[in-house]
Swiss-Prot record, chain A:
A Pfam family hit: UFC1
Protein name as catalogued: Ubiquitin-fold modifier-conjugating enzyme 1
Similarity field: Belongs to the ubiquitin-conjugating enzyme family. UFC1 subfamily.
CDD domains with a match to the protein in the record: UBCc_UFC1
Keywords annotated in UniProt: Ubl conjugation pathway
Coiled-coil features, chain-numbered ranges: none
Active site: C119
Function: E2-like enzyme which forms an intermediate with UFM1 via a thioester linkage.
GO molecular-function term, one example from the UniProt record: UFM1 conjugating enzyme activity
The keyword Cell wall biogenesis/degradation is annotated on this UniProt entry: no
Disulfide bond sites: none
From Swiss-Prot, chain B:
An MF annotation (GO) of this entry: ATP binding
PANTHER family linked to this entry: UBIQUITIN-ACTIVATING ENZYME E1, UBIQUITIN-LIKE MODIFIER-ACTIVATING ENZYME 5
Region ranges (Disordered): 339-396
InterPro entries: D-isomer_DH_CS1 (IPR029752), ThiF/MoeB/HesA (IPR045886), ThiF_NAD_FAD-bd (IPR000594), Ubiquitin-activating_enz (IPR035985)
Stated role: E1-like enzyme which activates UFM1.
Active site, renumbered: C263
Keyword Cytoplasm: no
Listed name of the protein: Ubiquitin-like modifier-activating enzyme 5
Keyword Protein transport belongs to the record: no
Family named by the database record: Belongs to the ubiquitin-activating E1 family. UBA5 subfamily.
Keywords: ATP-binding, Metal-binding, Nucleotide-binding, Ubl conjugation pathway, Zinc
Binding locations of ATP: G92, D113, K136, N159, N197
Source organism per UniProt: Arabidopsis thaliana (Mouse-ear cress)
Top-rank taxon: Eukaryota
Length: 174, 431
C-alpha cells in the first residue's frame, strides 16, 4: 500500500472490512457475507457523495447476489465518460477477486481481456490475495476499478479510441 | 451426403416451378451447389475401428501404438479406450494435449473453454487461420474428429469460474454414461488443467477437491521460456490452494510486479514441450508404466528439468482439501497393512533361500527394528519436522484468532436484514 496516494489510503481506511469467508454456495454464510458487502458498499457510496466524488452505481441483478451490474464514470477535461459495469462473483470468491467488466471498451485497449475484463493482475490482485477475506466488492471498485479508469481513460480518449457522446453526435451529424 | 445434396437440388427444381419469383430459389440452388462442391473436396473420414489391432499394415492407425505392448512397455494398451480425460482450457497447451491424446486413441475427451480462435493464436500449434472466429471448443472438435473418429468428444463452451459454469463443470465430470461399469464416483479418470489464469486454476482445484478427483496442473511462464506440470491427488499431495500465492507468502511489495500491457509472451516450442510432458505423465498414470512425476519443471534457458514432491498443508485454506487430508489419514492403516503384506511376501521369498551359514558358532542374530519404526511413525504422525528443517511460513493461529474476534462483533449484525440493506443501496443509487 506504500505506493498508493494519500486520498486513496484515507478512503480505504474508512470502507468497512468484511469478516465472513463465504462463497456463493455457502448458504447462510453467503447471506451474511452479502450483508457485509452491502454495508461496505453503502458506506463507500455515502462517503463518495459527501465528498462530491460520486463515480459509480452498482447493485445485484439476481437474488443470489452472484451477478452485479451498474455504471461507472470518469471525468476527463471536464467531460464525463460513462460506461456500463458488470461482473460475476466467481465460484471461489473470496479466495479469488471478481473480474470487473466494461463491455463497451472491449477490444479498444490492450489493458483488457476478452469480454471487457479489465486487467488487475499487477496493481490489485496481489492486494486482494493479501487481504482475503477482508476485502469485498467496495474495495475492488476503490482499489481496482478506480485506478484503472484514472490510468486508462485519458489515454483512450486522447488516442481517439473513446469518444464522448456529444462528440459522437457531432460527427454523426456532419 | 452427396445423395442428400442431389435430393435437395431436385426439391428446389419442383419449388421453382410452383413459385412465381425464381430469384430466391436460384440463390438457394447456388448455395446448395456450393456446399456440394465443398463436400466433394473434403476427404472422406475413415470408418471407426472396433478393436485395436497390432497388425503392421499401412491402413491400421493403431499399429505403432500397439507396438508399445509388444515391446513390453505397456501391459495392455487397449485399455486406453476405457479412459475419459477432461481438458480445461483449449489454449497453447490444452489444444496440443487434446491432439496428442486423440492420436493415442483415448476413449473420451471433455473440452472446456470460452474463448474464440484469433489470428494472434497462430504463433502456437493446433489451430488454423481458417478457424479464426470459431469458438476454440468447436474448432478443436472439428479437427480432432477428423484425426481420430474413434474418440468420443464432448465440448463445453463456458466459463467454469461462474456459479452456473462451475455446476455444469462438476456435473459433467461425474457423468458416467461413457463407462457405467467403472467403480468410483467420478465419470472421468483424469482432469488436465491447461488454463492461463489463477482464478480458473482455483475453480478446477475446488471441483477436484470436492469430487476426490485426481488431476494434473500445467503452466507456462509469462516470458515463455519455462513451464511445469504437477500431479494433484486430493488429500495425498498439496492442492493448488495449499501454498499461499507467492505475493502473500514472500511479502513481496506488489509494486515490483511490473508489467507493460496485458499480453504475455508465448512460444509454440515451450507450449509444445509442456503439453508433451503433461500427456506423457497422463499416459503413465493411466496405463501404469514408468514413473509418474508428482512435479516436473522445464527451464528451457538451461535445459533443466527439476522434480519434487509437495505434501498437503495441514492448515490449507480450502475446506474440501482438509477433508480429503483427513480421509487420507484415516485410510493410513489400510495402506500400512497393504505395505506390510507386500513386505511379508518379499520376506517369504527371502526366507525360502534359508540361512547363509549352516552353523552359527557365536550365536549372532539380526534383531527386528519394529519398535524403532513405531517411534518413527509416531513422530511423523505428530507432524514433527525432521531434524535440521524449520518451517518457512507462520502457522495460522494468529489469523484465526483475529477472525474469532471479528466474528464476535459480527453477531450484532445478525439482526440486519438483507432486503433492507439492498433497498438502502438502491436508494443511494437513485439519489
Amino acid at each position: 500500500m506504500e505506493g498508493w496516494d494519500p486520498n486513496t489510503k484515507s478512503t480505504l481506511t474508512r470502507i468497512p472490512l468484511l469478516t465472513t469467508k463465504a462463497g456463493p454456495r455457502d448458504g447462510a454464510a453467503w447471506t451474511q457475507r452479502l450483508k457485509e458487502e452491502y454495508k461496505s458498499l453503502i458506506a463507500y457510496t455515502q462517503m463518495n457523495k459527501s465528498n462530491d466524488n460520486d463515480w459509480f452505481r452498482i447493485s445485484a441483478s439476481n437474488p443470489e447476489g452472484t451477478r452485479w451490474t451498474g455504471k461507472c464514470w470518469y471525468v476527463h477535461n471536464l467531460l464525463k465518460y460513462e460506461f456500463d459495469l458488470q461482473f460475476d462473483i466467481p465460484i471461489t470468491y473470496p479466495a479469488t477477486a471478481p473480474e470487473l467488466e466494461l463491455p463497451e471498451i472491449d477490444g479498444k485497449t490492450q489493458k483488457m481481456y476478452r469480454g471487457g475484463k479489465i486487467c488487475l493482475t499487477v496493481h490489485f490482485k496481489p492486494l486482494w490475495a493479501k487481504n482475503c477475506p477482508r476485502f469485498g466488492i467496495a474495495h475492488a471498485l476503490c482499489l481496482g476499478l478506480a485506478p484503472w479508469l484514472a490510468a486508462e481513460i485519458p489515454i483512450l480518449v486522447d488516442s481517439g479510441a473513446i469518444k464522448h457522446k456529444d462528440d459522437a453526435a457531432t460527427s454523426a451529424e456532419s | 451426403m452427396e445423395v442428400g445434396f442431389k435430393a435437395l437440388l431436385d426439391d428446389l427444381d419442383v419449388l421453382e416451378k410452383s413459385l412465381s419469383d425464381p430469384a430466391l430459389i436460384n440463390k438457394l440452388r447456388s448455395h446448395v451447389e456450393n456446399l456440394a462442391t465443398l463436400s466433394k473436396c473434403n476427404p472422406h473420414r475413415r470408418s471407426k475401428v472396433k478393436e485395436l489391432s497390432s497388425e503392421v499394415v499401412d491402413s491400421n492407425p493403431y499399429s505403432r501404438l500397439m507396438a508399445l505392448q509388444r515391446m513390453g512397455i505397456v501391459d495392455n494398451y487397449e485399455r486406453i479406450r476405457e479412459f475419459s480425460v477432461a481438458i480445461v482450457g483449449i489454449g497453447g497447451v490444452g489444444s496440443v494435449a487434446a491432439e496428442m491424446l486423440t492420436r493415442c486413441g483415448i476413449g473420451r475427451l471433455l473440452l472446456y473453454d470460452y474463448d474464440t480462435v484469433e489470428l494472434a493464436n497462430m504463433n502456437r500449434l493446433f489451430f488454423r487461420p481458417d478457424q479464426v472466429g470459431m469458438t476454440k471448443t468447436d474448432a478443436a472438435v472439428q479437427t480432432l474428429a477428423e484425426i481420430n473418429p474413434d474418440v468420443v468428444l464432448e465440448s463445453f463452451t463456458m466459463n467454469i469460474t461462474t456459479v452456473q459454469g462451475f455446476e455444469t463443470f462438476t456435473s459433467s465430470l461425474t457423468n458416467k454414461s461413457f463407462c457405467p461399469s467403472k467403480e468410483g464416483g467420478s465419470g472421468v479418470d483424469l482432469v488436465l488443467s491447461c488454463v492461463d489464469n489463477y482464478e480458473a486454476r482455483m475453480a478446477v482445484n475446488q471441483a477436484c477437491n470436492e469430487l476426490r478427483q485426481t488431476w494434473m496442473e500445467s503452466g507456462v511462464s509469462e516470458d515463455a521460456v519455462s513451464g511445469h506440470i504437477q500431479l494433484l491427488v486430493p488429500g495425498e499431495t498439496a492442492c493448488f490452494a495449499c501454498a499461499p500465492p507467492l505475493v502473500v507468502a514472500s511479502g513481496i511489495d506488489e509494486r515490483t510486479l511490473k508489467r507493460e500491457g496485458v499480453c504475455a509472451a508465448s512460444l509454440p516450442t515451450t507450449m509444445g514441450v509442456v503439453a508433451g510432458l503433461l500427456v506423457q505423465n497422463s499416459l503413465k498414470f493411466l496405463l501404469n508404466f514408468g514413473e509418474v512425476s508428482p512435479y516436473l519443471g522445464y527451464n528451457s534457458l538451461k535445459d533443466f528439468f527439476p522434480t519434487m514432491k509437495m505434501r498437503p498443508n495441514p492448515q490449507c485454506s480450502n475446506v474440501a482439501c482438509l477433508e480429503r487430508q483427513k480421509e487420507y489419514m484415516l485410510a493410513k492403516p489400510e495402506r500400512d497393512a497393504a505395505a506390510k503384506a507386500k513386505m511379508e511376501a518379499d520376506a517369504s521369498t527371502t526366507i525360502d533361500e534359508g540361512p547363509l551359514h549352516d552353523d552359527n558358532e557365536w550365536n549372532i542374530s539380526v534383531v527386528d527394528d519394529e519398535n524403532e519404526k513405531d517411534t518413527t511413525k509416531a513422530a511423523s504422525s505428530s507432524d514433527t519436522l525432521p531434524e535440521g528443517l524449520t518451517r518457512e511460513l507462520p502457522v495460522a493461529d494468529e489469523y484465526e484468532k483475529a477472525i474469532a474476534i471479528a466474528s464476535g462483533s459480527g453477531e450484532t449484525e445478525e439482526e440486519d436484514d438483507l432486503e433492507d440493506l439492498k433497498k438502502q443501496l438502491e436508494a443511494l443509487n437513485a439519489a
